[in-house]
Amino acid sequence: MSLDLASLLNPEQYKAASQIEGPELIIAGAGSGKTRMITYRIAYMLSKGIDQSEILALTFTNKAAKEMADRVRETVGKKLDKLTTTTFHSFGLGLLKMYIQYLGYRNDFTLYDENDNISLIKNCIVTLGYQLADYNVRTLRDFFSQYKTERIPLPEKGTAVREIYDEWLMTQKAYNVVDFDDLIILPIKIFEKKPEILERVQLRWRYIMVDEFQDTSLLQYKLVSMIAAKYRNLAVVGDDDQSIYSWRGANYQNIINFEKDFPERKEYRLERNYRSTGNILSAANALIVHNKERKDKKLWTESGEGASISIMRHPTGEEEAMWIATHIRKLMREHHYNFSDFGVLVRTNSLMNTLETTFVESQIPVRVSGGSSFFDRKEIRDMLCFLKILVNENDDNSLLRIINTPRRGIGRTTVERLRRYADEKNTTLHIALEELSAAPEFRESTRKALQDFIKMIHRWKDMVNTPDRLLDTIVQDTCYEAMVREEFPESDKAVAFKMRGIQFLSERLSTYLKEHKDATLRDYLRSVSIIGDENDDDKSMVSLMTMHASKGLEFKVVFLAGIEDHIIPSARALEEDNRNIDEERRLFYVAITRAREKLYINYSDTRRDREGKEKTTLPSRFLEEIPNTLFQNEEKTPEETLKDNISSAKAFLEMLKNKNKK
């Protein structure tokens, strides 16, 4: 197979792809065709007679590894069973399966996940005679990971934390278990202890590529540089401007380490962007140049300047969400976009609730990434089921979910008897509950539990037409918060988070009923259910995600929400050193460069904090780093606002009408 790389790639891509001997540093800017270059580089190596079994390509997700392998396979048109395209952790696991016995482990070791480790740490605390209540075990687990990976110094010997840590390490080995950190750490130890094994691995993989190199940790870099040390055919591809994972150990300084360790390297920069318009790239370039410790690069495009970047100021976070929802509808009408053309990006998960609920209530299908969907959270699903049984006595499914949630003495045997009775009488579970609540076949305690539950349902039904306090009453009557505290005995923060979610749902319900004249509780439940019913069939959905989750993705239209100081840059970054501010700036850069055609930057004068309190906010200081000439203000006349609201209302009513016909 021969490849004419020069005709398939641009000049810089060609230079990077055609060098296959010796170390190589490829700085690939956002949207610069990095994946295409990597694909053709591997294909070119195969065309030059390099055996596929000698090539190792490492990346960070299974999805990326599979995509890389699939693209190379399509390009060369043959099976590549011996080509190794994998993640760092999968590669490390493979090495341990072959060589872990040299560290005193048995080959039948078990891989522990985070929850396994948390349980093990709890056991160690108890074994040593300490009190579980004195420790936040999840926080302890995070510290242990940082100790193990040498990201922070070990605590002094003799301290309780050091004693628990040492016990945990000893117990892991005694149990013949490893965790995800060990998948990198232990292969390094094997290579250091047994140089002949390192040489065997070096002979096997003579040509190594690392994608997303800026995301590697110091230990991951150490592992790969040890393997590459003999033949020095190591190509690393990355962009220091997109290094946004320091909190999980990524160290963009590895680019500098690579330059020191491989002084004979060749270096290439991919700066031509195939994704975004000129104005979007100008904003990104103007922003990121304020980071001093970076490789000099400037993205450019031949696709023209495109539309100006829109910046919008809102009175509140709720009005920001409604404006974005309305504007998505407007752009779809005017430019024939699909829902899947839109990405809505936020800095933190806490900003998602208002946006997601607004989209759902506005009949905009939404897919949540980088955080859990508000409507998928257990406590929210529970509350919605409580509400559903009040407006629909035929909804057996919802009743089954909450009949003993929280536990009220209605056990599985009782529920099965109610279900059998409903089947025999061809009636609903609700009626079975009413008719059997005094049945002598049940114990007195069971009858009382059934009757008390029925009384609660009747009381709640009386509040359906004035539902402002309905959810508060349900929470109080069922002792729901006590159940949550039982589930999270060690975390007041988790309890507060879940109870705030219920309060937020209550506020959304009240707001919906105030804003939609003559609307009922049933209407609200329908509005939040329509999207859920259609999601499986309708793949065209707006993507709502964190900026971290957006890395590697692109959208025709991007809305950035909550672009305010203490959100981006985060409050923690503002309190700490400039290095943290630089990472926040890189995160904003990543968010901007997800946009292909249009970019909307939004901020609000006030916003609710995590406790639900309204706080005054200021626009992000990063906005001052982008030239005003690139911005246009998205102001609306009252007539335009009214027109948009009427149009959205009509669309909503039409969707409800069609839903009812089904």
PLM regions with names:
Residues I26, A30-I38, I42, I100, ...:
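Helicase P-loop NTPase motor core
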